[in-house]
């Protein structure tokens, strides 16, 4: 499987690398993409050194099966067509597509089946607070129907992922 990570040098991109390795995700080829600032940076993944490529509107995503994106909403929106035009499934970690009716908003523990219906080739995930909440609520819903819930959430001043 050919896998790409967009925003590979950021905190979330680095976490993608760690989790993919930790869970022994089946990867034949890993492509890393980033900004002008991070292009050329090298990371080691499963004993192999991989250089971050500059993210551009070209055919670099041809043959990619899955692209994990964590470079911010603007970048996700700007590059979505470039990433998906050759059939890659884009799994976006930004807020860019969370309200798009043609993009499933998926928390695998709760609605994994929704990921199968992706007219635009994109899967979005909710805000991190929402993810934790709905996983817990799903367990409660399995026991007894929840009619209503009131939630207050306090968010970090920066969603960048690093202090």
Question: PLM features: residue spans?
Answer:
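N-terminal Rossmann-like NAD(P) cofactor-binding subdomain of oxidoreductases
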Residues: 1-163
């Amino acid at each position: 499987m050919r896998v790409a990570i967009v925003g590979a040098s950021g905190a979330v991109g680095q976490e993608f690398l760690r989790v993919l390795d930790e869970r022994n995700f089946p990867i034949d080829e890993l492509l890393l993409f980033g900004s002008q600032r991070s292009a050329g940076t090298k990371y080691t993944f499963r004993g192999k050194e991989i250089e971050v490529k500059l993210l551009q509107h070209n055919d670099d995503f041809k043959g990619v099966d899955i692209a994990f994106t964590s470079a911010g909403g603007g970048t996700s929106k700007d590059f979505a067509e470039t990433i998906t035009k050759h059939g890659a499934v884009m799994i976006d970690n930004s807020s860019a597509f969370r309200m798009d009716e043609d993009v499933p908003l998926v928390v695998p523990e709760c609605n994994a089946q929704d990921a199968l219906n992706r007219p635009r080739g994109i899967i979005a995930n909710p805000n991190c607070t929402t993810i934790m909440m709905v996983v817990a609520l799903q367990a409660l819903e399995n026991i007894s129907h929840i009619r209503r819930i009131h939630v207050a959430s306090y968010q970090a001043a920066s969603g960048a992922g690093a202090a």
